[in-house]
């Protein structure tokens, strides 16, 4: 059954391999949770604060983050399938070694975000602030940064395979 949590004060969460499914979190503050290796399926986070969360190695399927704060979150080594980030603040978030399929980033503030060694398939960036974002050793083929701010973006060498097929 679906669970809805609205503006619920949550205690510090420290659990590994936690399963969350068919849930909506609205206006919740998660005080720097540690949920490494957890699984999220059919979950919506709306106006939630997940700043400084450690969600490394997590799996996200059909998850929406709407107007959330993920500042400084460790999201490395995650698997992201059919996920939407809409108008989120994600400065200094770390997505290193992530695998992304069918993911959309829209209208987000993503300054200094790390996307090192990521794999992208059907990923879209729309109206994002990617100032100083890092994409080293990440193939950017098929991506479009046409309507996003990419000042100071860091990638591999200008002649490297990483830039082939990128639209700016």
Report residues per predicted region:
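Tandem repeat scaffolds
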Residues: 1-168
């Amino acid at each position: 059954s679906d669970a809805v949590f609205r503006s619920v004060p949550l205690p510090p969460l420290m659990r590994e391999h936690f399963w969350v499914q068919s849930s909506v979190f609205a206006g919740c503050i998660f005080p720097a949770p540690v949920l490494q290796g957890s699984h999220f399926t059919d979950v919506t986070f709306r106006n939630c604060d997940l700043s400084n969360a450690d969600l490394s190695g997590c799996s996200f399927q059909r998850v929406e983050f709407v107007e959330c704060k993920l500042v400084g979150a460790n999201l490395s080594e995650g698997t992201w399938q059919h996920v939407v980030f809409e108008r989120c603040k994600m400065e200094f978030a770390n997505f290193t070694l992530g695998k992304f399929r069918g993911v959309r980033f829209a209208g987000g503030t993503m300054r200094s975000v790390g996307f090192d060694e990521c794999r992208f398939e059907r990923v879209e960036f729309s109206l994002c602030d990617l100032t100083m974002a890092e994409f080293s050793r990440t193939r950017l083929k098929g991506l479009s940064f046409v309507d996003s701010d990419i000042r100071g973006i860091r990638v591999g060498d200008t002649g490297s395979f990483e830039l082939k097929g990128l639209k700016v």
